[in-house]
């Protein structure tokens, strides 16, 4: 089952331990109960003698998108990560090669636009912005955004095990696909959409137009 996430991927009780053990066998899931720990058995770089996970993977797993966007390599960009989990390496690699980031971008932008307008409102967003609020959230979720660039993809084979009995474990592959968009590029697309929806929305009062312009000022200085 495909899951795209932009949140912390592992439970706080889990840890990553890079080991030199490589497995060519199909992982055999076993029942786990209670607290579990996690270790990396193998990853994309293992065959090339690369022991450490890429910084972007390690950062994303540990701190999510917010941590990833603080790395010097991605300052000035918005980051989007797609993830697939499965028990077959070929299957997750195929997923990574065909991953379409557009839906992830649209969902993220819509969520951030919703939060931006809600946070800037003095009361109910519907009261401050009228029908415009609903229109802009819908439009941002359905829009197609340009400028996304694939940076890298990486798979890891993870073993989740019972610390009291390592024989009780499950193995799974996780693949991550990283895309970025320059903040200036995406912000301008969203600002253009804000103006377009405002022009199309009927019955917007002067007070609501002022509230919308205030949100634009916040976005121009801070981004989405």
Please describe what each predicted stretch is.
Residues 21-224:
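Domain-level marker for long, solvent-exposed, non-transmembrane regions
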């Amino acid at each position: 089952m495909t899951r795209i996430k932009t949140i912390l991927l592992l439970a706080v009780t889990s840890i990553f331990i890079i080991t030199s053990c490589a497995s060519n066998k199909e992982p055999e899931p076993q029942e786990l109960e209670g607290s579990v720990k996690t270790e990396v058995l193998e990853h994309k770089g293992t065959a090339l003698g690369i022991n450490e996970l890429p910084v972007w993977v390690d950062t994303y797993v540990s701190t999510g998108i917010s941590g990833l966007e603080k790395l010097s390599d991605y300052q000035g960009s918005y980051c989007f990560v797609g993830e697939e989990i499965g028990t077959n390496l070929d299957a997750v690699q195929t997923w990574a090669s065909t991953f379409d980031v557009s839906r992830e971008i649209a969902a993220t932008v819509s969520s951030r636009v919703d939060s931006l307008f809600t946070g800037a409102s003095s009361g109910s967003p519907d009261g401050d912005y009228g029908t415009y609020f609903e229109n802009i959230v819908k439009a941002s979720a359905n829009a197609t955004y340009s400028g996304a660039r694939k940076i890298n993809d990486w798979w890891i084979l993870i073993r989740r095990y019972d610390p009291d009995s390592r024989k009780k474990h499950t193995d799974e592959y996780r693949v991550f696909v990283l895309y970025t968009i320059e903040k200036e590029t995406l912000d301008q697309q969203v600002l253009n959409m804000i103006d377009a929806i405002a022009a199309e929305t009927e019955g917007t009062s002067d007070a609501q137009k002022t509230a919308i312009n205030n949100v634009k000022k916040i976005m121009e200085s801070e981004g989405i």
